[in-house]
Protein backbone atom coordinates (compact mmCIF):
# COMPACT_ATOMS: atom_id res chain seq x y z
CA UNK A 1 0.00 0.00 0.00
CA UNK A 2 1.43 3.36 -1.02
CA UNK A 3 1.93 5.73 1.89
CA UNK A 4 0.69 8.61 -0.27
CA UNK A 5 -2.80 7.06 -0.02
CA UNK A 6 -2.42 6.94 3.77
CA UNK A 7 -1.17 10.54 3.96
CA UNK A 8 -4.13 11.77 1.90
CA UNK A 9 -6.52 9.95 4.25
CA UNK A 10 -4.73 11.37 7.31
CA UNK A 11 -5.10 14.88 5.89
CA UNK A 12 -8.86 14.40 5.50
CA UNK A 13 -9.15 12.94 9.01
CA UNK A 14 -7.23 15.84 10.49
CA UNK A 15 -9.51 18.37 8.83
CA UNK A 16 -12.82 16.95 10.08
CA UNK A 17 -14.42 17.47 13.48
CA UNK A 18 -17.26 15.00 12.79
CA UNK A 19 -16.83 11.65 14.54
CA UNK A 20 -18.88 9.64 12.03
CA UNK A 21 -17.01 11.13 9.07
CA UNK A 22 -13.69 10.35 10.79
CA UNK A 23 -14.73 6.72 11.32
CA UNK A 24 -15.93 6.37 7.71
CA UNK A 25 -12.60 7.71 6.41
CA UNK A 26 -10.80 5.20 8.60
CA UNK A 27 -13.00 2.30 7.45
CA UNK A 28 -12.29 3.12 3.80
CA UNK A 29 -8.55 3.35 4.48
CA UNK A 30 -8.48 -0.04 6.23
CA UNK A 31 -10.35 -1.66 3.34
CA UNK A 32 -7.70 -0.41 0.89
CA UNK A 33 -4.89 -2.14 2.79
CA UNK A 34 -3.54 -5.51 1.74
CA UNK A 35 -1.25 -7.84 3.70
CA UNK A 36 0.28 -4.76 5.27
CA UNK A 37 -2.96 -4.10 7.22
CA UNK A 38 -1.38 -4.87 10.64
CA UNK A 39 1.51 -2.49 9.86
CA UNK A 40 -0.96 0.23 8.85
CA UNK A 41 -2.83 -0.27 12.13
CA UNK A 42 0.37 0.13 14.17
CA UNK A 43 1.30 3.31 12.29
CA UNK A 44 -2.23 4.63 12.92
CA UNK A 45 -1.56 4.11 16.63
CA UNK A 46 1.77 5.92 16.35
CA UNK A 47 3.55 2.65 17.20
CA UNK A 48 5.55 -0.13 15.58
CA UNK A 49 3.70 -2.93 17.35
CA UNK A 50 1.50 -3.62 20.37
CA UNK A 51 2.51 -1.82 23.58
CA UNK A 52 3.65 -4.98 25.34
CA UNK A 53 6.47 -5.51 22.84
CA UNK A 54 7.95 -2.16 23.87
CA UNK A 55 9.30 -1.33 20.39
CA UNK A 56 10.37 2.31 20.10
CA UNK A 57 12.32 4.10 17.38
CA UNK A 58 14.54 5.80 20.01
CA UNK A 59 14.22 8.85 17.76
CA UNK A 60 13.73 11.87 20.02
CA UNK A 61 12.56 15.31 18.89
CA UNK A 62 16.13 16.50 19.39
CA UNK A 63 17.45 13.82 17.03
CA UNK A 64 14.82 14.68 14.42
CA UNK A 65 15.89 18.33 14.64
CA UNK A 66 19.49 17.20 14.10
CA UNK A 67 18.48 15.20 11.00
CA UNK A 68 16.44 18.10 9.61
CA UNK A 69 19.41 20.39 10.12
CA UNK A 70 21.64 18.04 8.13
CA UNK A 71 19.03 17.83 5.37
CA UNK A 72 18.41 21.57 5.11
CA UNK A 73 21.62 23.32 6.21
CA UNK A 74 19.47 25.23 8.72
CA UNK A 75 20.97 25.38 12.19
CA UNK A 76 19.55 23.15 14.92
CA UNK A 77 18.88 26.22 17.09
CA UNK A 78 16.79 27.86 14.38
CA UNK A 79 14.77 24.68 13.79
CA UNK A 80 14.26 24.29 17.56
CA UNK A 81 12.91 27.86 17.76
CA UNK A 82 10.45 27.21 14.94
CA UNK A 83 9.41 23.96 16.64
CA UNK A 84 8.75 25.83 19.90
CA UNK A 85 6.44 28.21 18.01
CA UNK A 86 4.59 25.53 16.03
CA UNK A 87 4.41 22.88 18.74
CA UNK A 88 4.56 20.14 16.09
CA UNK A 89 7.82 18.77 14.72
CA UNK A 90 5.90 17.16 11.83
CA UNK A 91 4.80 20.57 10.56
CA UNK A 92 8.41 21.79 10.73
CA UNK A 93 9.59 18.76 8.73
CA UNK A 94 6.93 19.50 6.09
CA UNK A 95 7.94 23.17 5.81
CA UNK A 96 11.62 22.26 5.41
CA UNK A 97 10.76 19.59 2.81
CA UNK A 98 8.81 22.14 0.78
CA UNK A 99 11.95 24.30 0.48
CA UNK A 100 14.50 21.55 -0.09
CA UNK A 101 16.53 21.30 -3.27
CA UNK A 102 18.03 17.88 -2.46
CA UNK A 103 16.20 14.64 -3.30
CA UNK A 104 17.39 11.04 -3.27
CA UNK A 105 19.18 10.02 -6.47
CA UNK A 106 17.44 6.63 -6.38
CA UNK A 107 13.82 7.10 -5.39
CA UNK A 108 12.41 4.40 -3.11
CA UNK A 109 8.73 3.56 -3.41
CA UNK A 110 7.24 4.86 -0.17
CA UNK A 111 4.96 2.04 0.91
CA UNK A 112 3.56 1.34 4.36
CA UNK A 113 5.86 -1.70 4.59
CA UNK A 114 8.97 0.26 3.58
CA UNK A 115 8.29 2.93 6.19
CA UNK A 116 7.55 0.37 8.92
CA UNK A 117 10.70 -1.58 8.02
CA UNK A 118 12.79 1.60 8.18
CA UNK A 119 11.36 2.56 11.57
CA UNK A 120 12.02 -0.97 12.84
CA UNK A 121 15.67 -0.57 11.79
CA UNK A 122 15.80 2.59 13.91
CA UNK A 123 14.36 0.68 16.86
CA UNK A 124 16.78 -2.24 16.56
CA UNK A 125 19.94 -0.18 16.09
CA UNK A 126 22.15 -0.35 19.18
CA UNK A 127 25.73 0.33 20.24
CA UNK A 128 28.23 2.85 18.97
CA UNK A 129 27.12 4.60 15.83
CA UNK A 130 23.43 3.95 16.57
CA UNK A 131 22.61 7.67 16.72
CA UNK A 132 24.11 8.27 13.28
CA UNK A 133 22.32 5.20 11.93
CA UNK A 134 18.96 6.56 13.13
CA UNK A 135 19.65 10.00 11.66
CA UNK A 136 20.63 8.37 8.35
CA UNK A 137 17.44 6.27 8.36
CA UNK A 138 15.33 9.38 8.93
CA UNK A 139 17.25 11.19 6.18
CA UNK A 140 16.38 8.32 3.83
CA UNK A 141 12.68 8.79 4.59
CA UNK A 142 12.97 12.57 4.32
CA UNK A 143 14.65 12.49 0.91
CA UNK A 144 12.19 9.96 -0.53
CA UNK A 145 8.97 11.49 0.80
CA UNK A 146 6.72 14.31 -0.28
CA UNK A 147 6.32 17.15 2.25
CA UNK A 148 2.91 15.82 3.31
CA UNK A 149 4.26 12.29 3.74
CA UNK A 150 7.25 13.34 5.86
CA UNK A 151 4.96 15.38 8.12
CA UNK A 152 2.91 12.31 9.00
CA UNK A 153 5.94 10.00 9.12
CA UNK A 154 7.59 12.37 11.59
CA UNK A 155 4.45 12.46 13.72
CA UNK A 156 4.29 8.67 13.70
CA UNK A 157 7.89 8.52 14.91
CA UNK A 158 7.07 10.84 17.83
CA UNK A 159 3.83 9.00 18.63
CA UNK A 160 1.72 12.14 18.09
CA UNK A 161 -0.21 11.61 14.86
CA UNK A 162 -2.74 14.38 15.68
CA UNK A 163 -5.62 13.08 13.57
CA UNK A 164 -8.02 12.59 16.48
CA UNK A 165 -8.31 8.81 16.63
CA UNK A 166 -7.94 6.41 19.54
CA UNK A 167 -7.79 2.63 19.91
CA UNK A 168 -11.57 2.66 20.44
CA UNK A 169 -12.09 4.49 17.13
CA UNK A 170 -9.74 2.11 15.31
CA UNK A 171 -11.45 -0.95 16.82
CA UNK A 172 -14.86 0.40 15.79
CA UNK A 173 -13.57 0.92 12.24
CA UNK A 174 -12.04 -2.58 12.14
CA UNK A 175 -15.40 -4.13 13.09
CA UNK A 176 -17.25 -2.06 10.47
CA UNK A 177 -14.70 -2.94 7.80
CA UNK A 178 -14.22 -6.67 8.39
CA UNK A 179 -16.90 -8.15 10.67
CA UNK A 180 -20.60 -8.36 11.39
CA UNK A 181 -21.41 -5.65 13.90
CA UNK A 182 -23.36 -8.16 16.02
CA UNK A 183 -19.90 -9.36 17.18
CA UNK A 184 -18.84 -5.86 18.23
CA UNK A 185 -19.01 -6.50 22.00
CA UNK A 186 -17.31 -9.90 21.71
CA UNK A 187 -14.49 -8.41 19.61
CA UNK A 188 -14.01 -5.63 22.15
CA UNK A 189 -13.76 -8.26 24.90
CA UNK A 190 -11.19 -10.16 22.83
CA UNK A 191 -9.17 -6.95 22.40
CA UNK A 192 -9.27 -6.33 26.16
CA UNK A 193 -7.59 -9.69 26.73
CA UNK A 194 -5.33 -9.49 23.65
CA UNK A 195 -4.58 -5.76 23.05
CA UNK A 196 -3.09 -6.08 19.58
CA UNK A 197 -5.24 -4.28 17.02
CA UNK A 198 -2.96 -5.30 14.17
CA UNK A 199 -3.49 -8.99 14.91
CA UNK A 200 -7.24 -8.61 15.42
CA UNK A 201 -7.67 -6.67 12.15
CA UNK A 202 -5.59 -9.20 10.22
CA UNK A 203 -7.59 -12.19 11.50
CA UNK A 204 -10.95 -10.52 10.91
CA UNK A 205 -9.92 -9.55 7.38
CA UNK A 206 -9.21 -13.26 6.74
CA UNK A 207 -12.66 -14.13 8.10
CA UNK A 208 -11.27 -15.83 11.21
CA UNK A 209 -13.95 -14.56 13.60
CA UNK A 210 -13.82 -17.82 15.60
CA UNK A 211 -10.12 -17.31 16.36
CA UNK A 212 -10.87 -13.84 17.72
CA UNK A 213 -13.84 -14.98 19.81
CA UNK A 214 -11.65 -17.62 21.47
CA UNK A 215 -9.11 -15.07 22.69
CA UNK A 216 -8.69 -14.93 26.45
CA UNK A 217 -5.91 -14.44 28.99
CA UNK A 218 -2.57 -15.59 27.57
CA UNK A 219 0.73 -15.74 29.49
CA UNK A 220 3.18 -13.00 28.43
CA UNK A 221 0.46 -10.97 26.70
CA UNK A 222 -0.91 -8.30 29.07
CA UNK A 223 -4.63 -7.60 29.25
CA UNK A 224 -6.64 -4.51 30.12
CA UNK A 225 -7.29 -4.79 33.84
CA UNK A 226 -10.74 -4.90 35.42
CA UNK A 227 -11.87 -1.64 37.04
CA UNK A 228 -14.29 -0.62 39.80
CA UNK A 229 -17.30 1.66 40.02
CA UNK A 230 -17.60 3.95 43.06
CA UNK A 231 -20.07 4.64 45.84
CA UNK A 232 -19.77 6.87 48.89
CA UNK A 233 -20.91 4.63 51.76
CA UNK A 234 -20.67 1.10 53.09
CA UNK A 235 -24.45 0.93 53.34
CA UNK A 236 -24.92 1.80 49.65
CA UNK A 237 -22.36 -0.80 48.65
CA UNK A 238 -23.97 -3.57 50.70
CA UNK A 239 -27.36 -2.70 49.24
CA UNK A 240 -25.92 -2.80 45.71
CA UNK A 241 -24.18 -6.12 46.41
CA UNK A 242 -27.27 -7.85 47.81
CA UNK A 243 -26.42 -7.49 51.50
CA UNK A 244 -23.04 -9.22 51.64
CA UNK A 245 -19.76 -9.18 49.70
CA UNK A 246 -15.99 -9.25 50.03
CA UNK A 247 -13.98 -6.16 50.96
CA UNK A 248 -10.27 -5.76 50.17
CA UNK A 249 -7.77 -3.05 51.03
CA UNK A 250 -7.37 -0.53 48.19
CA UNK A 251 -3.61 -0.02 48.03
CA UNK A 252 -2.01 3.20 46.78
CA UNK A 253 0.45 1.73 44.31
CA UNK A 254 0.99 0.77 40.68
CA UNK A 255 -1.35 -1.79 39.13
CA UNK A 256 0.85 -4.70 38.10
CA UNK A 257 0.25 -7.88 36.12
CA UNK A 258 2.65 -10.73 36.92
CA UNK A 259 2.97 -13.26 34.07
CA UNK A 260 4.74 -16.57 34.64
CA UNK A 261 5.47 -19.24 32.03
CA UNK A 262 7.99 -22.08 32.25
CA UNK A 263 10.12 -20.27 34.81
CA UNK A 264 10.14 -16.96 32.94
CA UNK A 265 8.55 -13.88 34.54
CA UNK A 266 7.34 -10.65 32.94
CA UNK A 267 5.66 -7.69 34.64
CA UNK A 268 3.29 -5.23 32.97
CA UNK A 269 1.69 -1.93 33.99
CA UNK A 270 -2.01 -1.11 33.63
CA UNK A 271 -1.09 0.57 30.32
CA UNK A 272 0.29 -2.79 29.04
CA UNK A 273 3.89 -1.53 29.10
CA UNK A 274 6.50 -4.02 30.27
CA UNK A 275 8.11 -3.08 33.60
CA UNK A 276 10.12 -6.27 34.18
CA UNK A 277 13.53 -4.59 33.95
CA UNK A 278 12.53 -1.85 36.39
CA UNK A 279 11.70 -4.35 39.13
CA UNK A 280 14.41 -7.06 39.07
CA UNK A 281 13.78 -7.84 42.75
CA UNK A 282 10.12 -8.63 42.12
CA UNK A 283 10.93 -10.64 39.00
CA UNK A 284 13.46 -12.77 40.90
CA UNK A 285 11.09 -13.22 43.83
CA UNK A 286 8.28 -14.36 41.53
CA UNK A 287 10.48 -17.11 40.09
CA UNK A 288 11.21 -18.34 43.61
CA UNK A 289 7.72 -17.89 45.05
CA UNK A 290 5.35 -19.43 42.51
CA UNK A 291 5.90 -23.11 41.74
CA UNK A 292 3.59 -23.22 38.74
CA UNK A 293 3.95 -23.96 35.03
CA UNK A 294 2.07 -20.81 34.07
CA UNK A 295 0.01 -18.12 35.76
CA UNK A 296 -1.28 -14.57 35.33
CA UNK A 297 -1.74 -12.59 38.55
CA UNK A 298 -3.31 -9.17 39.16
CA UNK A 299 -2.13 -6.94 41.98
CA UNK A 300 -0.78 -3.62 43.19
CA UNK A 301 2.96 -2.89 43.52
CA UNK A 302 3.47 -0.74 46.61
CA UNK A 303 6.75 0.77 47.92
CA UNK A 304 7.46 0.44 51.63
CA UNK A 305 9.94 1.48 54.32
CA UNK A 306 12.35 -1.48 54.81
CA UNK A 307 12.92 -0.50 58.46
CA UNK A 308 9.35 0.01 59.65
CA UNK A 309 7.29 -1.80 57.01
CA UNK A 310 5.20 1.37 56.57
CA UNK A 311 3.63 1.70 53.12
CA UNK A 312 4.80 4.64 51.02
CA UNK A 313 2.41 6.57 48.71
CA UNK A 314 2.23 5.91 44.97
CA UNK A 315 4.55 8.79 44.00
CA UNK A 316 7.56 7.07 45.62
CA UNK A 317 7.45 4.25 43.09
CA UNK A 318 8.24 6.79 40.35
CA UNK A 319 11.85 6.81 41.61
CA UNK A 320 12.16 3.29 40.21
CA UNK A 321 10.19 3.60 36.97
CA UNK A 322 12.28 4.22 33.88
CA UNK A 323 15.64 3.78 35.63
CA UNK A 324 18.40 1.87 33.87
CA UNK A 325 21.20 2.22 36.41
CA UNK A 326 21.70 1.59 40.15
CA UNK A 327 18.59 -0.60 40.22
CA UNK A 328 20.02 -2.89 42.91
CA UNK A 329 20.74 0.09 45.15
CA UNK A 330 17.32 1.63 44.57
CA UNK A 331 15.66 -1.76 45.10
CA UNK A 332 17.18 -1.99 48.57
CA UNK A 333 16.35 1.63 49.41
CA UNK A 334 12.79 1.47 48.05
CA UNK A 335 11.68 -2.18 48.18
CA UNK A 336 8.38 -3.20 46.63
CA UNK A 337 5.62 -5.50 47.80
CA UNK A 338 3.07 -6.73 45.28
CA UNK A 339 -0.28 -7.16 47.01
CA UNK A 340 -2.09 -9.79 44.95
CA UNK A 341 -5.87 -9.82 44.71
CA UNK A 342 -6.70 -11.89 41.64
CA UNK A 343 -5.62 -14.67 39.31
CA UNK A 344 -7.00 -15.05 35.77
CA UNK A 345 -4.93 -17.95 34.43
CA UNK A 346 -3.24 -21.01 35.95
CA UNK A 347 -1.43 -23.93 34.31
CA UNK A 348 -3.27 -23.68 30.99
CA UNK A 349 -6.68 -22.92 32.49
CA UNK A 350 -8.56 -19.68 31.78
CA UNK A 351 -9.98 -18.51 35.12
CA UNK A 352 -11.63 -15.32 33.90
CA UNK A 353 -15.07 -16.97 33.89
CA UNK A 354 -14.52 -18.57 37.30
CA UNK A 355 -16.37 -16.79 40.18
CA UNK A 356 -14.33 -14.39 42.32
CA UNK A 357 -14.47 -16.48 45.52
CA UNK A 358 -13.05 -19.52 43.74
CA UNK A 359 -10.34 -17.42 42.05
CA UNK A 360 -9.34 -16.05 45.46
CA UNK A 361 -9.07 -19.57 46.94
CA UNK A 362 -6.91 -20.65 44.01
CA UNK A 363 -4.69 -17.58 44.48
CA UNK A 364 -4.27 -18.31 48.20
CA UNK A 365 -3.28 -21.91 47.44
CA UNK A 366 -0.38 -21.30 45.05
CA UNK A 367 2.11 -19.39 47.21
CA UNK A 368 3.38 -18.56 50.67
CA UNK A 369 3.48 -14.86 51.50
CA UNK A 370 6.84 -13.06 51.63
CA UNK A 371 8.15 -9.48 51.65
CA UNK A 372 7.80 -9.39 47.86
CA UNK A 373 4.37 -10.98 47.40
CA UNK A 374 1.46 -10.77 49.80
CA UNK A 375 -2.29 -11.24 49.61
CA UNK A 376 -4.48 -8.15 49.69
CA UNK A 377 -6.11 -7.97 53.12
CA UNK A 378 -9.72 -9.08 52.89
CA UNK A 379 -12.92 -9.83 54.76
CA UNK A 380 -16.36 -11.06 53.72
CA UNK A 381 -19.16 -9.33 55.55
CA UNK A 382 -22.69 -7.99 55.53
CA UNK A 383 -22.27 -6.07 58.79
CA UNK A 384 -21.82 -2.32 58.20
CA UNK A 385 -20.11 -1.82 61.59
CA UNK A 386 -17.54 -4.52 60.83
CA UNK A 387 -16.87 -3.05 57.38
CA UNK A 388 -16.46 0.45 58.86
CA UNK A 389 -13.84 -0.92 61.27
CA UNK A 390 -12.06 -2.65 58.39
CA UNK A 391 -12.17 0.59 56.38
CA UNK A 392 -10.59 2.52 59.25
CA UNK A 393 -7.86 -0.13 59.51
CA UNK A 394 -7.14 0.28 55.79
CA UNK A 395 -6.73 4.06 56.16
CA UNK A 396 -4.54 3.58 59.24
CA UNK A 397 -2.35 1.13 57.31
CA UNK A 398 -1.69 3.72 54.58
CA UNK A 399 -4.28 2.59 52.03
CA UNK A 400 -6.76 4.65 50.02
CA UNK A 401 -9.82 2.75 51.24
CA UNK A 402 -11.54 -0.48 50.23
CA UNK A 403 -12.68 -2.29 47.11
CA UNK A 404 -15.90 -4.25 47.51
CA UNK A 405 -16.15 -7.37 45.34
CA UNK A 406 -19.20 -9.36 44.43
CA UNK A 407 -19.27 -12.98 45.64
CA UNK A 408 -22.14 -13.93 43.32
CA UNK A 409 -21.91 -16.95 40.97
CA UNK A 410 -21.39 -14.60 38.00
CA UNK A 411 -18.58 -12.55 39.60
CA UNK A 412 -16.28 -13.10 36.63
CA UNK A 413 -13.10 -11.19 35.75
CA UNK A 414 -14.12 -8.71 33.05
CA UNK A 415 -11.01 -7.30 31.40
CA UNK A 416 -11.13 -3.59 30.62
CA UNK A 417 -14.58 -3.24 32.15
CA UNK A 418 -15.72 -0.89 34.88
CA UNK A 419 -18.81 -2.43 36.46
CA UNK A 420 -20.70 -3.04 39.68
CA UNK A 421 -18.96 -6.36 40.39
CA UNK A 422 -16.22 -4.22 41.97
CA UNK A 423 -16.99 -0.98 43.84
CA UNK A 424 -14.39 1.27 45.43
CA UNK A 425 -14.88 3.19 48.65
CA UNK A 426 -12.26 5.83 49.39
CA UNK A 427 -11.61 8.20 52.26
CA UNK A 428 -14.47 10.61 52.99
CA UNK A 429 -13.32 14.11 52.14
CA UNK A 430 -15.92 15.62 54.49
CA UNK A 431 -17.62 18.44 52.55
CA UNK A 432 -15.72 17.52 49.41
CA UNK A 433 -16.34 14.82 46.83
CA UNK A 434 -15.88 11.38 48.33
CA UNK A 435 -13.34 10.39 45.71
CA UNK A 436 -10.63 11.96 43.60
CA UNK A 437 -11.13 12.36 39.86
CA UNK A 438 -8.64 11.58 37.10
CA UNK A 439 -9.17 14.24 34.43
CA UNK A 440 -7.52 14.88 31.05
CA UNK A 441 -6.02 18.27 30.20
CA UNK A 442 -7.41 19.60 26.89
CA UNK A 443 -6.59 23.31 27.07
CA UNK A 444 -5.06 26.20 29.00
CA UNK A 445 -5.70 29.86 29.75
CA UNK A 446 -2.83 32.36 30.01
CA UNK A 447 -2.04 33.68 33.47
CA UNK A 448 -2.15 37.30 34.60
CA UNK A 449 -0.51 39.22 37.42
CA UNK A 450 1.65 36.86 39.47
CA UNK A 451 0.98 34.09 36.96
CA UNK A 452 2.02 36.08 33.91
CA UNK A 453 4.35 34.02 31.74
CA UNK A 454 2.68 30.71 32.51
CA UNK A 455 -0.83 29.23 32.43
CA UNK A 456 -3.29 30.60 34.95
CA UNK A 457 -5.71 27.70 34.59
CA UNK A 458 -6.09 24.40 32.75
CA UNK A 459 -9.22 23.16 30.99
CA UNK A 460 -9.99 19.61 32.12
CA UNK A 461 -12.23 16.96 30.62
CA UNK A 462 -13.85 13.64 31.38
CA UNK A 463 -13.86 10.76 28.90
CA UNK A 464 -17.12 9.78 27.21
CA UNK A 465 -16.47 6.07 26.69
CA UNK A 466 -19.59 5.69 24.56
CA UNK A 467 -18.67 8.35 21.99
CA UNK A 468 -14.86 8.21 22.40
CA UNK A 469 -14.74 11.94 23.12
CA UNK A 470 -13.49 14.25 25.87
CA UNK A 471 -16.05 16.55 27.50
CA UNK A 472 -15.01 19.59 29.53
CA UNK A 473 -15.85 19.51 33.23
CA UNK A 474 -13.91 22.35 34.91
CA UNK A 475 -11.21 25.02 34.77
CA UNK A 476 -8.45 24.25 37.26
CA UNK A 477 -6.15 26.87 38.78
CA UNK A 478 -5.68 25.69 42.39
CA UNK A 479 -3.32 23.24 44.07
CA UNK A 480 -0.15 24.06 42.12
CA UNK A 481 3.16 24.86 43.78
CA UNK A 482 5.05 27.74 42.13
CA UNK A 483 7.58 25.30 40.65
CA UNK A 484 4.86 23.18 39.05
CA UNK A 485 2.88 26.22 37.93
CA UNK A 486 5.75 27.79 36.01
CA UNK A 487 6.76 24.45 34.47
CA UNK A 488 3.34 23.91 32.85
CA UNK A 489 4.12 25.51 29.43
CA UNK A 490 7.18 23.29 29.07
CA UNK A 491 5.27 20.19 30.20
CA UNK A 492 2.51 20.70 27.66
CA UNK A 493 4.38 22.18 24.68
CA UNK A 494 4.53 18.85 22.83
CA UNK A 495 0.73 18.49 23.00
CA UNK A 496 -0.22 21.94 21.67
CA UNK A 497 -2.82 21.94 18.88
CA UNK A 498 -3.49 24.90 16.59
CA UNK A 499 -7.21 24.16 16.75
CA UNK A 500 -9.64 22.21 18.88
CA UNK A 501 -8.83 18.47 18.57
CA UNK A 502 -11.61 16.45 16.95
CA UNK A 503 -12.27 14.34 20.05
CA UNK A 504 -12.68 17.35 22.36
CA UNK A 505 -16.24 18.62 22.93
CA UNK A 506 -16.13 22.13 24.39
CA UNK A 507 -18.17 25.31 24.55
CA UNK A 508 -15.19 27.17 25.98
CA UNK A 509 -12.37 28.56 23.85
CA UNK A 510 -9.09 28.36 25.81
CA UNK A 511 -6.02 30.34 24.80
CA UNK A 512 -4.24 27.08 23.96
CA UNK A 513 -5.67 23.71 22.90
CA UNK A 514 -3.96 20.43 23.80
CA UNK A 515 -4.30 16.99 22.28
CA UNK A 516 -5.68 14.70 25.04
CA UNK A 517 -2.59 13.11 26.59
CA UNK A 518 -1.94 14.19 30.20
CA UNK A 519 -4.08 12.94 33.10
CA UNK A 520 -4.06 14.62 36.52
CA UNK A 521 -5.72 13.81 39.84
CA UNK A 522 -8.21 16.38 41.09
CA UNK A 523 -10.46 16.81 44.12
CA UNK A 524 -13.43 19.17 44.28
CA UNK A 525 -16.26 20.33 46.50
CA UNK A 526 -19.23 18.99 44.56
CA UNK A 527 -20.71 18.30 41.13
CA UNK A 528 -22.98 21.06 39.80
CA UNK A 529 -25.12 21.69 36.72
CA UNK A 530 -23.26 23.94 34.29
CA UNK A 531 -24.47 25.83 31.20
CA UNK A 532 -20.82 26.10 30.12
CA UNK A 533 -19.33 22.61 30.38
CA UNK A 534 -20.17 19.63 28.17
CA UNK A 535 -19.71 16.68 30.54
CA UNK A 536 -22.94 14.59 30.46
CA UNK A 537 -24.51 17.35 28.36
CA UNK A 538 -28.32 17.31 28.38
CA UNK A 539 -28.52 14.43 30.86
CA UNK A 540 -29.79 16.52 33.79
CA UNK A 541 -30.97 19.73 32.14
CA UNK A 542 -31.42 20.68 28.52
CA UNK A 543 -28.52 22.76 27.15
CA UNK A 544 -26.42 22.12 30.29
CA UNK A 545 -23.68 19.76 31.37
CA UNK A 546 -22.02 19.00 34.70
CA UNK A 547 -18.96 20.58 36.28
CA UNK A 548 -16.68 20.13 39.28
CA UNK A 549 -17.03 23.01 41.74
CA UNK A 550 -13.84 24.36 43.39
CA UNK A 551 -11.47 21.83 41.73
CA UNK A 552 -8.00 21.47 43.21
CA UNK A 553 -4.93 19.60 41.94
CA UNK A 554 -3.83 16.93 44.44
CA UNK A 555 -0.24 17.07 43.17
CA UNK A 556 -0.45 13.68 41.46
CA UNK A 557 0.10 13.43 37.70
CA UNK A 558 -1.43 10.10 36.65
CA UNK A 559 1.41 9.00 34.39
CA UNK A 560 0.17 5.42 34.73
CA UNK A 561 -3.08 6.31 32.95
CA UNK A 562 -3.95 6.98 29.34
CA UNK A 563 -6.54 9.70 28.56
CA UNK A 564 -9.07 6.94 27.90
CA UNK A 565 -8.55 5.78 31.51
CA UNK A 566 -9.83 9.11 32.84
CA UNK A 567 -12.95 9.43 34.97
CA UNK A 568 -15.86 9.00 32.57
CA UNK A 569 -18.74 11.39 31.98
CA UNK A 570 -21.06 8.59 33.08
CA UNK A 571 -19.24 8.35 36.42
CA UNK A 572 -19.63 12.11 36.97
CA UNK A 573 -23.34 11.77 36.19
CA UNK A 574 -23.67 8.94 38.74
CA UNK A 575 -21.77 10.98 41.33
CA UNK A 576 -24.13 13.91 40.76
CA UNK A 577 -27.17 11.67 41.24
CA UNK A 578 -25.71 10.17 44.43
CA UNK A 579 -24.89 13.65 45.70
CA UNK A 580 -28.48 14.83 45.08
CA UNK A 581 -29.81 11.71 46.77
CA UNK A 582 -27.67 12.35 49.86
CA UNK A 583 -28.74 16.01 50.10
CA UNK A 584 -32.41 14.97 49.82
CA UNK A 585 -31.99 12.36 52.57
CA UNK A 586 -30.25 14.87 54.85
CA UNK A 587 -33.11 17.36 54.41
CA UNK A 588 -35.83 14.79 55.11
From Swiss-Prot:
Entry EC no(s): 6.5.1.1
Cofactor(s) annotated in UniProt: Mg(2+)
EC primary class: ligase
Keywords assigned: ATP-binding, Cell cycle, Cell division, DNA damage, DNA recombination, DNA repair, DNA replication, Ligase, Magnesium, Metal-binding, Nucleotide-binding
Gene Ontology biological-process entries: cell division; DNA biosynthetic process; DNA recombination; DNA repair; lagging strand elongation
Record-stated family: Belongs to the ATP-dependent DNA ligase family.
Protein name in UniProt: DNA ligase
UniProt gene name: lig
Amino acid sequence: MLFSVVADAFEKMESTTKRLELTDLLVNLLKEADDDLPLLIYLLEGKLGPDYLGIETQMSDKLIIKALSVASNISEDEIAKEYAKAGDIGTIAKEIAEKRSLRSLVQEEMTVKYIHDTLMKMARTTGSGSTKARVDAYMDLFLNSTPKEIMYITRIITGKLRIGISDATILDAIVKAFADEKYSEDIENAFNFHPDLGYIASELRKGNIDAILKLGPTPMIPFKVMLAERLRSVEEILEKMGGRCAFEYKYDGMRTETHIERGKVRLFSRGNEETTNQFPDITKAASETFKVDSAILDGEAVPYDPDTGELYPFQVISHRRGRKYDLDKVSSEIPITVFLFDIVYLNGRDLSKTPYTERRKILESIFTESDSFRLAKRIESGDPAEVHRFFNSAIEDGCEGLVAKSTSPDSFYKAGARGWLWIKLKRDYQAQLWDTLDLTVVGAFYGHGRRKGTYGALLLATYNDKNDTFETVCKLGSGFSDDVLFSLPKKFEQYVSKEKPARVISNLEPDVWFYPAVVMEVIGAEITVSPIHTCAYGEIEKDSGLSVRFPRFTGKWREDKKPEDSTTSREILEMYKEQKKTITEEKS
